Design a protein with these regions (language model features):
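Beta-hairpin "wing" of winged helix-turn-helix
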Residues: 109-110
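Generic structural signal for hydrophobic core residues of well-folded globular domains
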Residues: 27-31, 50-54, 100, 145-148
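Long, hydrophobic N-terminal alpha-helical segment
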Residues: 2-51
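Glycine-rich, aromatic-bearing surface loops/beta-hairpins
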Residues: 123-162
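Basic amphipathic alpha-helical segments that dock to polyanions
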Residues: 94-106
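Minor-groove-contacting beta-hairpin "wing" of winged helix-turn-helix DNA-binding domains
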Residues: 113-118
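Short, well-structured hydrophobic secondary-structure segments
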Residues: 36-69, 75-76
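Helix-adjacent hinge/juxtasegments
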Residues: 70-92
Length: 162
């Protein structure tokens, strides 16, 4: 991974660690509303590739109350290239987590689940329409991952071998 000042302007803006951390935090917090134990680390790796990918985000945003498994089944195009997107987004996911840890916004439980720390991040969504959309969709994914409650099912739904 290149140093921050050596990255292209577009990459610095699109994959800003603070924004990536915020999107991750929204998903983690939403997951905790369904399951207080926190989100498994393996599921958290799927959040950014889903929320920052415009097509995926738009499909979920258009039907936020639908079940994720049903929505994914109806929209198979979401899975095209998804495994590669996850791999490509790992460095940015780790940077986002690094910033959240540094700022004391998340903790890692003994069982490896990630939990949010209360009152560390504003509850209101601010920013451009697109950044707000990313945050709202992150909440949907967090909630749906918790409702499915099985990592293998989530991974298989998106065509990834766990």
């Amino acid at each position: 991974m290149k140093r921050w000042d050596q990255r292209p302007f577009e990459i610095r803006n699109l994959f800003n660690p603070a924004f990536c951390g915020l999107v991750l935090f929204r998903a983690l917090h939403s997951y905790e509303e369904e399951d207080a134990r926190g989100m498994p680390f393996s599921l958290s790796l799927l959040v950014l590739p889903l929320c920052l990918h415009k097509d995926s985000r738009e499909v979920i945003a258009s039907s936020p109350r639908s079940y994720l498994l049903k929505t994914t089944e109806k929209n198979q195009q979401l899975m095209v290239g998804f495994a590669d997107r996850v791999t490509q987004m790992l460095p940015y996911t780790f940077e986002g987590f690094g910033l959240l840890m540094e700022r004391g916004c998340i903790v890692i439980a003994d069982d490896g689940r990630i939990q949010t720390v209360p009152n560390k991040v504003r509850k209101t969504f601010t920013g451009t329409d697109e950044t707000v959309s990313c945050q709202k969709v992150a909440r949907v994914f967090g909630r749906e991952f918790a409702r499915i409650a099985d990592r293998v099912t989530v991974y298989m739904t998106f065509g990834i071998r766990p």
